[in-house]
Amino acid sequence: MPFRSRRRTLLTSIGVILLACLAAVTFLVVSGSGGAAHRAHATRPWQDAQTNHQVFPGGLWVNPGSLPAEEEQLLSKEGDVTAAALVQQIASQPIAVWLTGPSSRTALLSTLHRDLAEAKLAGKTPVFVLYAIPDRDCGNYSAGGFPTNASYLSWSETIARTLRGHPAVVLMEPDSIAMLGRSSCTSITKTRLHLLDEAVRTYSRDHIDVYLDGGNSHWQKASVMATRLREAGVKYARGFFTNVSNFYGVDPERAYADRLSGMLGGAHFVIDVSRDGPGWAGSWCNPDGAALGQNPHITLGDTPLDALLWVKTPGASDGTCNGGPAAGRWYQSYALSLVTNREAHHSAG
């Protein structure tokens, strides 16, 4: 009896202590004093998401409503069977969806809901490119974006909330970091990096894999990009992307990205291979000789390279240069040359 009585007293004391600890933890989470602890769990450094983490479940989604798909249908209706067959080689591949804002919230949500529903039906993962940051392209061919940082963040939050719970990958603002080395951009460097940091945290809180701008192998030094990426919040992202809308081959891009990844503690990366086929002569705007790269696919194995993607839409103009229409518009003759140039190189090889 005395032993059982002491045991009951001991268990009661332990229960009181546990309840007190639970109450203290609850207070920390909901009170202001626990705000820092709560925020620490609200955003997740990419290292926390590496183990057993599938970034592209089901593989890459082929968008049936892409610009090349629309053009293929139009050519078929017009009876241009040869051109339609060439464009089909582009349209049949998974290509990233570009969200370029500003647009109405209704239009944005309509695009996202439609694409997410179709990707879910196909059992694939869509890739979205955000391209609407203030002072986009620093006044060059693709100038534009939101007028204020606040409006950009509001737009980003809408996208993040909509993507939450869906397999989806976000590539955040091509050129936004690498371009800061230009004289026309230097005045916005600190503001830009801080804005990207805020934006990437938004997606991290909603458990969405984000890649930030990593430039390319022939632009900024890896050490320069590593410093900027840290300031832009890369620790809250999956990693970075390289070669978007550019033409450099996989080998130099992979070597550059591996160096940059090493400087960032092993951050993962993806590479745009949409137009990196052999034959490119060095010009960047609708260049002659460019060819489609290898078809996009996710990569397997224990390396930081997650996927080779088609981020830039093959056939979409780089801008009003070399006979092209405005940036992003369909450039038919250029699209056909990308396909035929790849075919020619394959035949020669």
Per-region residue spans from a language model:
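Secretory targeting and sorting signals
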Residues: S5-S31
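C-terminal region of N-terminal signal peptides and the immediate post-cleavage residues
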Residues: A23-A49
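Surface-exposed substrate-engagement region within the catalytic domains
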Residues: N52, N63, A69-Q89, T202, ...
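N-terminal carbohydrate-binding/catalytic regions of secreted carbohydrate-active enzymes
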Residues: H53-T162, T313, S317, N322-L338, ...
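Surface-exposed cleft-lining segments at the edges of enzyme active sites
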Residues: I95-S104, S142-P147, I177-I188, D209-G214, ...
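Structural preference for beta-strand elements that scaffold enzyme active sites
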Residues: A96, G123-V127, P167-L171, H207-Y211, ...
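Sec-exported extracytoplasmic/periplasmic mature domains
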Residues: A117-L121, R161-R164, V200-I208, R230-V234, ...
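Active-site cleft segment of glycoside hydrolase catalytic domains centered on the general acid/base Glu
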Residues: S142-H166, P174-I208, A222-S223
